[in-house]
Amino acid sequence: MVSRLRGFLAWVYRWITTTDHKDIGLLYLVTSIAFLLIAGSLALLFRVQLAIPKSNFLTGDAYYEAVTVHGLIMLLWFASPFAFGLANYIVPLQIGARDLAFPRLNALSYWLYLLSGLVLLASFFTESGAPNVGWTLYAPLTARIYTPGIGLDLAALAIFLFSLSVTLGTINFLVTIAAMRAPGIGWFKMPMFTWSILFTVILMLWAFPPLMVGGALLLLDRNLGTEFFLNPAGGALLWDHLFWFFGHPEVYILLFPALGAMADVISTFSGKPIYAKRYILTAFLIATIISFVVWMHHMFITGTNIYTRLFYSITTILISIPFEMAVMSFIFTLYKGRLVYTVPMLFAVGALLNFIIGGSTGVYLGSIAIDRGFRGTYWVVAHFHYILVGTVTLGLIAGLYYWWPKITGRTYSERLGKIHFALAMLGVALTFLPQFALMDMPRRYFTYDIPEWVPLNQLSTLGAFIFGGSMAIGLVNFLYSLVKGGSAAPNPWNSWTLEWFTNSPPPKHNFDGVPVVRKDNTVVFVSEEALSKYGKDAIVEGRVDVSNVPLSGGQSHSSHGLTHHGTTDPLVLAAGLTLALFGLFVSKPLSYLGAIVFLLSLARWLWKDVKNVFAEELPGYVEHWPFPKDKIRSAMWVFIASEVATFGSIFSAYFFIRFNPVGKFLTEAWPPGYLVHDVNVGLINTIILFTGTMLFTLAYLGVKRDNYLITLSGLLGTLFMAIYFLTVKYFEWKELLIAGLGLDAGMYMQAYYVTTGAHALHVILGVLATTYLLVKLFNGNLRGRQALSEVLAVGIYWGIVEIVWTLVFPLYYLV
């Protein structure tokens, strides 16, 4: 009994300390499926409610709670995390990497994802219940006067934590794909699934910051008395802009991984490379760009300028063209192919058919006139569910069936899989096709008494239960596979992408030797010694015969650092942060406890970095063009890109509020900054910040020349200037508050405090980073190429902090 308990505890400890990308991928998959079961159960509840007119199965509040949480989970906590479960496991294998660039950040991203979802679900157990304002969280319904209690606060907090998780994951995947590809894997030799994840994380990089900013402003409105979404100067339209600038790219964030998985599946089981791959990748790139200029088609009926509506109508129709190209590519790949109708192939083709239906019905909504008629009806519900359920969910299930033998080393029942597919397709059709005919039924009614709607709603409810049953069959199939499934061969599908060139499941180090993809597309495995001896280019070009060169397997994967990658730090850090923020709404002592845990865990994390416990440099043979072979600097540039979106959202809100004619007419005038603030104080802080940045340049030169005194002087000078800046800012705020210019002094002061507060928070993070470098210097570890990368990364960070201030100063102190 004791030995079993010890074994169980060891098993639990392994999973809570793992940083291996394959383990993290499995955690994402299992957790996202659990969230799917919750969201699906909520959907069945409100479908039962709608099956009968004047039903009392659910109260109005219960119905709206179910719809709201269902939508949020499906949008945020199921589809993307499921895709990233597959991506965590498969992408490093497809590009020949040992792991993601930052294994601990990968684990931290997962734990933040899990805990954010639990925070959302915790809202059900509050006195006010879960949020019931709809998954779009439209203002002004979200104001405390209309939605009291902490349920909505917890939902906003959950979204904030989830967005933080996404940011960390985005950095990790972009750096991994850009700078850790095995020799010979150029950009166009990457499989479609890896390409789709690359486009996805690029979208995430700029789509999630507006949501995070919007969520933060919502929490301020509800808890500190600001009026960003209540005052007519901001109001519902400001929320619409922030939410939908995230919301429409989110559609493609969900769609791209499914299309990538479908492409790999269709290519494999057609026996042909994907048709016109380079053109499709170009189309996906164009779609990625256009996706950021279509969000206002969700706002056609808000009274925006007719020419603005016309522009967004055109972009909405234009963005369909890249996806039409993808559909044609898949069809031409299938045409005259050696088709093998396996379970993953059936799901991929079924998802393709659903995509045609969902996509074509969405194009109608690009018309301003048609959108006016369909907006807020079940036509829209049917359209986006054909995309999100019929295409995204089934496409990702195709990927799961496809890679299941690789992930588990087990086979599954083809018969159960085909039953799963048939019922899923039937369920999608019965659930959502009737809803196109319900184009005159408002989508947010919890009951109705119109007889003509009854048969269609009952068909839809029947379809929902059939679809739910199909998912249960799929789950049984996977569980059966784990218990009774036969052993899977390393490459059961005779595929040609790199993940199939290792065992099923892969070993901890992924590959025995370093995979090299030669110019003729053959794959060889060599040791790191051979790469160093013969050179990467010679092996890739086939000028060297490596068939008899030993792999030296133990050495070739030692750089993965498996012996010391296990750590509880990501879990404890995520738990501390979540507890600290959760406690603000539930219990202040809980918040204090969480803050202590967070700070201690962060200190422990950074101390290990000071001691270079996890320090790893990229091997010299990786493909990284055109990016630097420096993952720390690359990660900082990616983070800076997300910061551009974050502060871009804040400044966009500033301009929207300041120049909104409705706000000017109904509210107080926006005063010139020089009448409110002392320009000299702003100028002094500008000089302080610029001086600190120049001193940091001195520190960089000191590390580069290995000069301790110059480095110390530069870092201490930067730290002093940053603290001086914060001190000046503190006394400036204090004087404003004494003068009665607090958050209750109007939108101008609210915008000022939010903008300068966000900037000050970034200065504090800079202080933390500079202190870390100082501690590392005192410990004698701030030297060499790794240290130079860290110093340069922190210098880049100080640069963006300085640039933001050059915008804050004139906007709030001069004009």
Curated annotation (Swiss-Prot):
There is a cross-link at H248-Y252 (1'-histidyl-3'-tyrosine (His-Tyr)). It comes from Aeropyrum pernix (strain ATCC 700893 / DSM 11879 / JCM 9820 / NBRC 100138 / K1). The gene is aoxB. Binds 2 heme groups. Its EC number is 1.9.3.-. The chain crosses the membrane at residues 26-46, 71-91, 105-125, 157-177, 197-217, 242-262, 281-301, 314-334, 339-359, 380-400, 419-439, 463-483, 580-600, 637-657, 683-703, 708-728, 736-756, 758-778, 791-811. Cu cation binds at H248, Y252, H297, H298. This is Heme-copper oxidase subunit I+III. Residues 545-815 are annotated as: COX3.
